[in-house]
A protein has these predicted regions:
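Noncatalytic carbohydrate-binding groove/subsite architecture in carbohydrate-active enzymes
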Residues: 140-189, 196, 201, 208-209, ...
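N-terminal carbohydrate-binding/catalytic regions of secreted carbohydrate-active enzymes
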Residues: 2-83, 89-97
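Well-ordered alpha-helical segments within folded domains of soluble proteins
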Residues: 10-30, 72-89, 128-145, 189-207, ...
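Long, well-ordered core segments of solenoidal/helical folds
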Residues: 1-4, 39-61, 98-117, 156-175, ...
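Structural helix-adjacent loops and short alpha-helical linkers that scaffold large soluble proteins
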Residues: 28-43, 86-102, 144-159, 203-219, ...
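Conserved small/polar residues in nucleotide/adenosyl-binding loops
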Residues: 324-330
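Extracytoplasmic mature domains of secreted/periplasmic and thylakoid-lumen proteins
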Residues: 75-78, 82-86, 91-123
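Non-catalytic carbohydrate-binding regions of carbohydrate-active enzymes
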Residues: 171-174, 206-309
């Protein structure tokens, strides 16, 4: 994962960061009955998203920046599309579904037979196919299938899932590599959100098809994620000892936790849920800046050296706090 390379890049205004705000808004709408909150912020959210909607390229979709000539990354758009699909399911506002479908059309434009299938990461470069542009594409496809009952979404989701598993899963530990280059070279870095999205995708496919292999995939991946992306921890602040989400990107970890929560709806596992709850509790109590109330990037709080305010971290913490208290976490 990397920040966009476009000369139009603005670290303070880009779709990836905005997407975490959309996820935070979605988490609040999904898990509370706060109508006033929705009425206060919904129109502003829509207006802001439309500033990123690129109508100069086909198929039309959200771009990385507020610029009609900007870079468009498939994964950045997909994260937004997933939240829009969720928001439609909750509110029945057709605006959300229309734009979620436009994201899907954009995804299909990035899918071809190079390397046997899969979705590219960058619309312009088309030099790699990444787990981060394929795993969430499956999640979006299955959410649209749930909404529309259109079998084309299911078939595309199954196809992309099969390709991603065959090309990007490490058979030694079930976790997912970062990407495969068009040259065939595999970038072997492992990030929590990639494996977490394949976990969620597997559960959604199991729900849609009833095929046990998908549930088996999800359970194996959950155990692998728990072993790799959590660690034993003693808090300098409280002295408590527990398994905690490893330091790194809070946003990556929030995306991974979506997979754990999806699986927990089907087959509960207290070990995973306790680790997530304790991680979030600790982060809430001990990793906030006293002056601003904003969160640092690190989860442990043992060695805070970064500045608070990273928008991805803030959006992730809103999602964490809402999702881990939801019915899915029971």
């Amino acid at each position: 994962p990397q920040e966009p390379s476009s000369p139009d890049y603005d670290s303070h205004a880009y779709l990836w960061g905005l997407g975490s705000v959309v996820s935070a808004f979605n988490a609040i709408v999904q898990n509370t009955d706060n109508v006033d909150f929705r009425m206060t912020y919904e129109s502003r959210l829509k207006e802001t998203l439309l500033k990123y909607y690129n109508t100069t390229k086909e198929p039309m979709c959200f771009g990385c920046f507020v610029n009609p000539h900007d870079q468009r990354l498939y994964d950045d758009a997909i994260w937004v599309g997933i939240d829009l699909a969720d928001l439609y399911s909750k509110t029945k506002d057709s605006w959300y579904l229309d734009y979620a479908k436009s994201v899907w059309n954009f995804v299909l434009s990035g899918k071809d037979d190079e390397l046997g299938g899969g979705v590219y990461w960058d619309e312009n470069a088309k030099d790699s196919k990444n787990t981060c542009s394929n795993a969430p594409a499956v999640v979006l496809a299955l959410k649209l299938y749930q909404i529309t009952n259109d079998a084309a979404y299911l078939e595309n989701g199954k196809d992309i899932y099969k390709w991603t598993k065959s090309k990007l899963q490490d058979p030694s530990d079930y976790l997912y590599w970062d990407c495969i280059k068009t040259s065939g070279k595999i970038e072997t870095s492992k990030f929590s959100y990639n494996s977490g999205q394949m976990m969620q995708a597997a559960v959604l496919l199991y729900n849609a098809t009833g095929e046990e292999q998908y549930l088996t995939d999800a359970k194996l991946l959950a155990e692998a994620c728990y072993n790799y992306f959590f660690e034993n921890f003693i808090s300098n602040s409280s002295g408590e000892q527990f398994r905690i989400l490893k330091d790194g990107s809070r946003w990556f970890n929030a995306i991974m936790v979506r997979g754990f929560l999806e699986l927990n709806k089907v087959e509960s596992n207290g070990t995973y849920m306790i680790a997530i709850r304790k991680s979030v509790d600790h982060a809430w109590k001990y990793t906030r800046d006293a002056e601003t109330g904003l969160f640092f990037k690190q989860f442990s709080g043992n060695d805070i050296t970064d500045n608070p305010g990273d928008i991805l971290a803030q959006g992730a913490m809103v999602e964490f706090c809402l999702l881990y208290t939801s019915d899915a976490a029971d």
